[in-house]
């Protein structure tokens, strides 16, 4: 299912788009999580959705299903990179069991020295096995490398405004199967139709999901400290701390703090962990 507007569900199959409605028990139990962008569905001859197949994953904000990658896109300059937001999006990806990648656009704005400095600041990504791509949509640098990486996958893009997401999507997409404006016209909703996540076919194969849903992202609904720690890969691949239930905050003999002191774990990542734990402690209490 590639798009939903006012009760109509647009399903792509073999290069065609079908305007569908929910049927039977699906219609009776309809809610915002019932049939979402990315769902694999079965449709009947009368264009009714009769079955929604089991999901690989489900993002809650934005609401999309069966995603392979979360592409976290930022600009090297104008606006400058928000490292805390990168960490929040990484946390979100790990929480929903979606593979993250980081894309930095506008590298043509940087001097050689600034580019070296940027790579150093983002070196923590390699330590946690997150691929990074440095691109310039304006100068067509690095775009084909990302396209080949995302080929035949379903990718949702997250990041702030002004970082070139539209230019990047325009490079990736094939001719749109059915534009939002065309759907709006058919439904006589006009150009002001509220648009949620929209699934766009890529010319190399696969889909890119354009969504406004990351604008108000928050810390996910993590249930306890152990779960939070599990979402920081760099905390897991080191020797055990002195205490089995170490919080990595106050305890002596903490190997996470030792790794931070030795610059083997990013201090910014560790500070983000502490800040997130504080937020969650307030939530849990």
From Swiss-Prot:
Residues holding Zn(2+): 241, 246, 248, 254
GO biological process: ribosomal small subunit biogenesis
Sequence positions that bind GTP: 105-108, 159-167
Localization in the cell: Cytoplasm
CDD domains: YjeQ_EngC
Domain of life: Bacteria
Molecular function terms from GO: GTP binding; GTPase activity; metal ion binding; rRNA binding
Coiled-coil annotated spans: none
EC number(s) on file: 3.6.1.-
Keywords: Cytoplasm, GTP-binding, Hydrolase, Metal-binding, Nucleotide-binding, Ribosome biogenesis, RNA-binding, rRNA-binding, Zinc
Cofactor note: Binds 1 zinc ion per subunit.
Gene Ontology CC entries for this record: cytoplasm
Location of the CP-type G domain: 56-217
Cofactor(s) listed in the protein's UniProt record: Zn(2+)
General function of this protein: One of several proteins that assist in the late maturation steps of the functional core of the 30S ribosomal subunit. Helps release RbfA from mature subunits. May play a role in the assembly of ribosomal proteins into the subunit. Circularly permuted GTPase that catalyzes slow GTP hydrolysis, GTPase activity is stimulated by the 30S ribosomal subunit.
Stated family: Belongs to the TRAFAC class YlqF/YawG GTPase family. RsgA subfamily.
Binding partners and assembly: Monomer. Associates with 30S ribosomal subunit, binds 16S rRNA.
Protein name, entry field: Small ribosomal subunit biogenesis GTPase RsgA
Gene: rsgA
């Amino acid at each position: 299912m590639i798009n939903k507007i006012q009760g109509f569900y647009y399903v792509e199959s073999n290069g065609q788009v079908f305007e569908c409605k929910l049927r039977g028990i699906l219609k009776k139990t309809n809610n915002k999580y019932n049939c979402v962008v990315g769902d694999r569905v079965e449709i009947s001859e009368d264009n009714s959705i009769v079955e929604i197949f089991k999901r690989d994953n489900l993002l809650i904000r934005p609401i999309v299903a069966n995603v392979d990658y979360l592409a976290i896109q930022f600009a090297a300059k104008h606006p400058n990179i928000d490292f805390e937001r990168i960490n929040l999006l990484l946390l979100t990806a790990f929480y929903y069991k979606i593979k993250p990648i980081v894309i930095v656009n506008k590298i043509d704005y940087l001097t050689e020295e600034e580019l070296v400095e940027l790579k150093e600041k983002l070196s923590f990504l390699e330590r946690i096995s997150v691929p990074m791509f440095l691109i310039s949509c304006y100068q067509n640098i690095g775009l084909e490398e990302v396209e080949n990486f995302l080929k035949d996958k379903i990718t949702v893009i997250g990041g702030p405004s002004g970082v070139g997401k539209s230019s990047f999507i325009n490079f990736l997409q094939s001719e749109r199967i059915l534009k939002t404006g065309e759907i709006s016209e058919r439904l006589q909703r006009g150009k002001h139709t509220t648009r949620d996540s929209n699934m766009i076919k890529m010319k190399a194969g696969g889909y890119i999901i354009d969504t406004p849903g990351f604008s108000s992202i928050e810390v996910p609904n993590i249930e306890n400290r152990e779960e939070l720690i599990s979402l920081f890969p760099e905390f897991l691949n080191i020797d055990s701390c002195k205490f089995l239930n170490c919080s990595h905050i106050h305890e002596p003999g903490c190997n996470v703090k030792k790794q931070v002191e030795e610059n083997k774990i990013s201090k910014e990542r560790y500070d983000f962990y502490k800040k997130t734990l504080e937020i969650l402690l307030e939530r849990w209490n």
